[in-house]
Design a protein with these regions (language model features):
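Positively charged n-region of N-terminal signal peptides that target proteins for export
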Residues: 1-5
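Hydrophobic core
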Residues: 10, 14-18
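Sec-dependent signal peptide cleavage junction
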Residues: 18-33
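C-terminal edge strands of extracellular/lumenal beta-sandwich accessory domains
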Residues: 29-47, 66, 85, 93-103, ...
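Asp/Glu-rich intrinsically disordered low-complexity tracts
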Residues: 46, 62, 73, 100-105, ...
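Non-catalytic, beta-strand-enriched accessory regions in extracellular/secretory proteins
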Residues: 51-75, 117-121, 133, 178-202, ...
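Surface-exposed beta-strand/loop patches in noncatalytic accessory domains
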Residues: 55-56, 83-117, 139, 152, ...
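A short beta-strand element within beta-rich, extracytoplasmic domains
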Residues: 75-84, 202-211, 329
Length: 329
């Protein structure tokens, strides 16, 4: 069994201010340790949530496993460092979440020797107490006995998606007037957020991203859950070359209405790129109430008042109902 040399981190917390809700990074100092073989989930090397860890793959069949358990919700950033070489060989780095007896793949990244010496992997929207694994294996043979370094950084915050949030039942809860950061970790990843309206009014949604001259991007779909059905309200394609702040069609919300925002791929080049989803709520009785696409579900229109609406898609219809009141005699 080969020896494993890596650098572990003794974490020391630096609190930035005392404001509730501010993300608090955790900083650390380095300590060197020797660890025996870590070629399975059961023998995975335990990593602190902040640190720098170096190792090598001893042969073409060698695999290295690492395990992390965050002590709070937040963002787990992972960087993979190596020395440049003029070769297409390298490493395959896979991240997993252990949940309900299964190892759920979050991301799978191939890093070649000729790639940048510091590669940022898709971040993990981590949950307190959950177990996460990093698996490193060879991508062809030239990376054998070449040192790599895994660096992890953890930011405590409630404003990050919580993987796995790829279904309605596991959606990340998004409070009113809040901002969340997420990323699509792989080609099949889906991120779903749930919003419960605190009253009648307008839920304005913006999708923010970093500009790139690229036609790939994200597909953002908004649903209302009512009567056991998920009713599509809008469906938008946002390319990386679109405006960095993209205004989605707003939701004409009803009190205690349940709404979902679903984010999927539009082609694949945006894998691992961060996006920001922001909602702003304006309570008011003078916005349409979706779904109001039939006579039966028409929004009541009060005489003498100004009401606002929007057509969220090519198929959207808005119905308004006016009830004539008899004059007093």
């Amino acid at each position: 069994m080969k020896k494993k040399l890596y650098s572990a981190i003794l974490a020391s917390i630096m609190v930035i201010g005392s404001i509730c809700g501010v993300a608090i990074p955790v900083y650390a100092k380095e300590e060197t340790k020797i660890i025996d073989g870590n070629d399975s989930y059961d023998t995975a090397t335990y990593l602190d949530i902040n640190g720098s860890y170096s190792d090598v793959l001893a042969d073409s069949d060698d695999v290295d496993f690492y395990k992390l358990t965050p002590d709070s919700n937040g963002k787990l950033s992972i960087h993979f460092g190596h020395t440049y070489g003029d070769s297409s060989d390298g490493w395959e780095v896979i991240t997993y979440k252990y949940q309900d007896g299964e190892y759920l793949e979050l991301s799978d990244t191939v890093i070649q020797l000729k790639d940048n010496e510091n590669i940022e992997l898709p971040f993990v929207g981590a949950q307190q107490g959950c177990k996460y694994y990093i698996k490193v294996k060879g991508y062809y043979g030239d990376a054998v006995n070449k040192k790599y370094t895994i660096k992890t950084t953890f930011t405590r915050s409630e404003q990050y998606e919580k993987e796995e949030n790829n279904s309605y039942s596991s959606a990340t809860e998004m409070g009113m007037n809040s901002t969340y950061t997420g990323t699509l970790n792989n080609k099949s990843d889906v991120d779903i957020y749930r919003i419960i309206s605190s009253g009648d009014g307008k839920i304005a949604l913006t999708f923010e991203h970093t500009y790139a001259e690229d036609s790939s991007g994200w597909n953002v779909i908004i649903y209302r859950y009512a009567n056991g059905e998920y009713q599509e309200l809008s469906n938008e394609i946002i390319e990386q070359k679109d405006s960095e702040v993209y205004q989605l069609p707003y939701i004409g919300a009803v009190s205690n209405g349940v709404y979902y925002v679903k984010i999927t791929h539009y082609y694949w080049e945006e894998i691992g790129k961060e996006y920001v989803l922001r909602n702003t709520f304006l309570q008011s009785g003078y916005y349409e109430k979706e779904e109001n696409d039939s006579y039966k579900t028409a929004t009541d229109l009060m005489v003498g008042k100004v009401h606002n609406g929007t057509l969220n898609s090519n198929n959207d219809k808005d119905f308004w109902k006016i009830t004539r009141r008899r004059p007093h005699t």
